[in-house]
Amino acid sequence: MKKSLFKRLTSMAISTVLLSTSVLGCGSNSGSSADGDNAEYRQVYSEEIKTLNYLKTAETNEFGALANMVDTLVEYDKYGVVKPCLATEWSANEDNTVWTFKIREGVKWVTKDGDEYADVEAQDFVDSLKYVLNNKNESETADIAAGIIKNGEKFYSGEITDFNEVGVKAVDKYTLQYTLEKPAPYFLSMLTYVCFFPVNGKFLEEKGDEFGTDPENILYNGGYVFDTFEPQSSRVYVANDKYWDKDN
């Protein structure tokens, strides 16, 4: 799929975010390196990033930046139409309560230094939702997932404690399945919300409370890596040379 310099923003109210932060939208090349190869992106900003923990934040400027560094199942094209990203294909049952996704093979998680850490797999989406729905983690977007995923609210509230009862599972290494509380033909659009972004469970466990505290404490599978961060000055992103779609 064709990539612009910066992907369109992911948000809980995507149309509002696109209007208010169009500098980062599709087709923008403002702030790119002089050679025009999109190898570096510099962003001047007015709002501070407080966390890179995309599974916890609901701040527009934070997940707006993170959406350029972490790919998820689907994304929007420049016309606002959902298209494949980490999911190559999907299907839903007749009443739109069970959704099955095939995960793109060969996608890499990399560190800030560009070292390969692991492959992106279906389990990464299970692990991320488990984190979001654990009320001890105080995810600001938990209500979105809890309101649509089967038994999500019950797990979040503590009514059930076995996460296997929650409507998400890795059928196999590259097949992911969500089961919903009710029919939701719009579910694809919800998958652009940060609560449905993937995370490598091993890395998340290793980092603990340090996850997302700085660029070294997250992994990247998207087109850019957070290179340098100067508070109240600028952010510098560099192209991820392990990116699965870097040639486009």
Describe every region a protein language model picked out.
Residues T88-I144:
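Aromatic- and charge-enriched surface segment that lines or borders ligand/interaction sites
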Residues V74, K78, E105-K108, K130-E138, ...:
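Sec-exported extracytoplasmic/periplasmic mature domains
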Residues E47, G64-N68, V81, C85, ...:
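Extracytoplasmic/secreted proteins, especially bacterial periplasmic and envelope-associated proteins
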Residues T161-E165, V171-Y174, T179-N248:
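Gly/Pro-rich hinge or "lid" segments in bacterial periplasmic/extracellular proteins
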Residues V44-E94, L219:
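N-terminal lobe/hinge region of extracytoplasmic solute-binding protein
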Residues M1-Y41, T51-Y54, V81:
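Short, low-complexity disordered leader/linker segments with a strong preference
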Residues D37-E47, V98-K102, F125-S128, L176-Q177, ...:
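Short, well-ordered beta-strand elements
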Residues D35-D37, I49-K56, G80-K83, W109-V110, ...:
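Short, solvent-exposed loop/turn elements at domain surfaces
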